[in-house]
Regions:
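Conserved SAM-binding loop of SAM-dependent methyltransferases across substrates and taxa
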Residues: 15-28
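Conserved SAM-binding motif I beta-strand of class I
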Residues: 30-35
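Conserved SAM/SAH-binding beta-strand->alpha-helix loop
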Residues: 37-39
Length: 225
């Protein structure tokens, strides 16, 4: 979801695989790879050297985006950490985040908190997709500074676990993702019922997820006709 970048910042780069991929695929001219772990940065440097890309990769020991100037990176990637942490990283250096042409985020969890932060702080989601890795579906969000896009009339204003763009794009992993959300809440509901309680909030979420599944199925059906 990054392309044509002059300088990309890979935040929490770990061993540098994303940084190197951006360079190898021509998606970025240069990359600043940062992490709070010196050993991880050393491995990122070794990988770049092995691939002959060391002149285009700079590694920085840094907490979040603290090292970035306000106009330094035109693309930012923050992947493989919790949504709340991603939000805190963006909030700690809003000038750099706001001035970037795009920010690509892949939260491991906490998608609701991240979406709330983006909407509250006037970031516009410009693309979304789902990826399947090791049996788990992850949401990838691409955003930039700007007024949030208006929500479709059928989409609740207080929904942050999923985005309407995934419905509009007919993402093939959307229905499996919604089913996994619903089934997780069903398990929690069954556990609560064994204790003699039926939380209304859980039943409402399950009903909402079933509604989303029906909408997604109808969209796929209409596209096929």
């Amino acid at each position: 979801m990054i392309n044509g970048s002059r300088l990309s910042a890979d935040i929490g780069c770990d061993h540098g695989r994303l940084s190197v991929a951006l360079l190898q695929q021509g998606r970025a001219d240069r990359v600043i790879a940062s992490d709070i772990s010196a050993p991880s940065l050393q491995k990122a440097t070794e990988l770049a050297t092995l691939c002959g890309l060391e002149s285009r990769l700079t590694t920085v020991l840094s907490d979040g985006m603290a090292h970035l100037g306000p106009d330094e990176a035109d693309a930012i990637a923050i992947c493989g950490m919790g949504g709340e942490l991603i939000a805190r990283i963006l909030e700690a250096n809003l000038p750099a985040a706001k001035n970037a042409r795009c920010i690509t985020m892949q939260p491991m969890r906490g998608i609701e908190e991240l979406r709330q932060f983006l909407r509250k702080n006037e970031f516009r989601i410009i693309d979304e997709r789902l990826v399947l890795d090791a049996g788990r579906i992850y949401q990838i969000i691409r955003a930039k500074s700007g007024d949030p896009a208006p929500l479709p009339g059928w989409f609740p204003q207080d929904e942050y676990s999923i985005g309407p763009m995934l419905f509009e794009k007919r993402d093939p992993l959307l229905i499996p993702l919604l089913e996994s959300y619903r089934d997780g809440h069903l398990r929690r509901l069954e556990k609560a019922r064994r204790k003699g309680v039926t939380p209304k909030a859980l039943t409402e979420i399950i009903d909402r997820m079933n509604g989303y599944i029906n909408i997604a199925q109808e969209m796929h059906k209409n596209e096929a006709e």
